[in-house]
Design a protein with these regions (language model features):
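N-terminal targeting signals for export/organelle localization
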Residues: 1-5, 102
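Structural microenvironment flanking redox-active thiols in thiol-disulfide oxidoreductases
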Residues: 61-68
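Conserved helix-turn-beta segment immediately C-terminal to the redox Cys motif
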Residues: 21-23, 38-59
Protein backbone atom coordinates (compact mmCIF):
# COMPACT_ATOMS: atom_id res chain seq x y z
CA UNK A 1 0.00 0.00 0.00
CA UNK A 2 1.36 3.39 -0.99
CA UNK A 3 1.35 6.71 0.68
CA UNK A 4 -2.06 8.14 1.57
CA UNK A 5 -3.48 11.39 0.23
CA UNK A 6 -3.67 13.98 3.03
CA UNK A 7 -6.51 16.40 3.72
CA UNK A 8 -5.29 19.97 4.27
CA UNK A 9 -7.20 22.84 5.88
CA UNK A 10 -6.62 26.55 6.40
CA UNK A 11 -5.32 25.64 9.87
CA UNK A 12 -2.83 22.99 8.70
CA UNK A 13 -1.74 24.27 5.28
CA UNK A 14 1.31 26.26 6.41
CA UNK A 15 2.74 23.50 8.61
CA UNK A 16 1.93 20.55 6.34
CA UNK A 17 2.56 22.11 2.92
CA UNK A 18 4.59 25.31 3.09
CA UNK A 19 6.99 23.99 5.75
CA UNK A 20 7.22 20.46 4.33
CA UNK A 21 10.65 18.99 3.63
CA UNK A 22 9.38 17.35 0.43
CA UNK A 23 7.66 18.62 -2.69
CA UNK A 24 3.88 18.69 -2.16
CA UNK A 25 1.11 18.36 -4.75
CA UNK A 26 -2.14 19.97 -3.60
CA UNK A 27 -5.47 19.32 -5.31
CA UNK A 28 -7.86 22.25 -4.73
CA UNK A 29 -11.34 20.72 -5.09
CA UNK A 30 -15.00 20.70 -3.99
CA UNK A 31 -17.40 17.78 -3.50
CA UNK A 32 -19.98 19.27 -5.91
CA UNK A 33 -17.38 19.50 -8.72
CA UNK A 34 -17.68 16.56 -11.15
CA UNK A 35 -14.22 17.00 -12.74
CA UNK A 36 -12.74 17.16 -9.22
CA UNK A 37 -14.19 13.74 -8.41
CA UNK A 38 -12.59 12.39 -11.59
CA UNK A 39 -9.19 13.60 -10.35
CA UNK A 40 -9.43 11.83 -6.96
CA UNK A 41 -8.18 8.40 -8.18
CA UNK A 42 -5.26 10.11 -9.90
CA UNK A 43 -4.22 11.76 -6.65
CA UNK A 44 -4.10 8.26 -5.10
CA UNK A 45 -2.05 7.10 -8.10
CA UNK A 46 0.37 10.03 -7.75
CA UNK A 47 0.79 9.45 -4.01
CA UNK A 48 1.68 5.81 -4.62
CA UNK A 49 3.77 6.26 -7.78
CA UNK A 50 5.82 9.17 -6.46
CA UNK A 51 6.10 8.03 -2.83
CA UNK A 52 9.39 9.24 -1.38
CA UNK A 53 9.63 12.09 -3.91
CA UNK A 54 6.28 13.76 -3.41
CA UNK A 55 3.59 14.25 -0.80
CA UNK A 56 0.03 14.50 -2.12
CA UNK A 57 -2.97 16.13 -0.52
CA UNK A 58 -6.16 17.97 -1.17
CA UNK A 59 -7.84 21.11 0.08
CA UNK A 60 -11.62 21.50 -0.09
CA UNK A 61 -12.08 25.09 -1.31
CA UNK A 62 -15.50 25.95 0.14
CA UNK A 63 -14.47 25.10 3.70
CA UNK A 64 -11.01 26.65 3.44
CA UNK A 65 -11.43 30.06 1.80
CA UNK A 66 -8.28 31.65 3.27
CA UNK A 67 -5.90 29.27 1.51
CA UNK A 68 -8.00 29.24 -1.67
CA UNK A 69 -7.99 33.04 -1.86
CA UNK A 70 -4.33 33.44 -0.87
CA UNK A 71 -3.27 31.29 -3.81
CA UNK A 72 -5.88 32.92 -6.08
CA UNK A 73 -7.55 29.65 -7.02
CA UNK A 74 -10.32 30.73 -9.39
CA UNK A 75 -11.49 27.44 -10.89
CA UNK A 76 -11.38 23.85 -9.76
CA UNK A 77 -9.86 21.42 -9.92
CA UNK A 78 -6.55 23.24 -9.62
CA UNK A 79 -3.34 21.37 -8.88
CA UNK A 80 -0.47 23.34 -7.35
CA UNK A 81 3.01 21.94 -6.76
CA UNK A 82 4.87 23.44 -3.80
CA UNK A 83 8.58 23.19 -2.97
CA UNK A 84 10.34 24.99 -0.11
CA UNK A 85 7.18 26.91 0.70
CA UNK A 86 6.73 28.30 -2.79
CA UNK A 87 4.47 27.49 -5.72
CA UNK A 88 6.57 25.96 -8.51
CA UNK A 89 3.84 24.87 -10.93
CA UNK A 90 0.09 25.06 -11.45
CA UNK A 91 -2.39 23.09 -13.54
CA UNK A 92 -5.96 24.32 -13.80
CA UNK A 93 -8.71 21.97 -14.91
CA UNK A 94 -9.04 18.20 -14.96
CA UNK A 95 -6.34 16.27 -16.79
CA UNK A 96 -5.77 12.61 -17.68
CA UNK A 97 -3.11 10.44 -16.09
CA UNK A 98 -0.54 10.92 -18.92
CA UNK A 99 -0.79 14.70 -18.53
CA UNK A 100 -0.51 14.44 -14.75
CA UNK A 101 2.56 12.24 -15.09
CA UNK A 102 4.16 14.70 -17.54
CA UNK A 103 3.32 17.62 -15.23
CA UNK A 104 4.94 15.90 -12.24
CA UNK A 105 7.95 14.55 -14.15
CA UNK A 106 8.70 18.03 -15.47
CA UNK A 107 9.01 19.41 -11.93
CA UNK A 108 10.47 16.57 -9.86
Amino acid sequence: MGQAVSDYTDATFASEVLQASTTVLVDFWAPWCGPCRLMAPMMDWAAETYAGKLSVGKLEVDGNPQTRDFFQVQGIPTLILFRDGKEVARQEGAIAKPQLQAFLDAHL
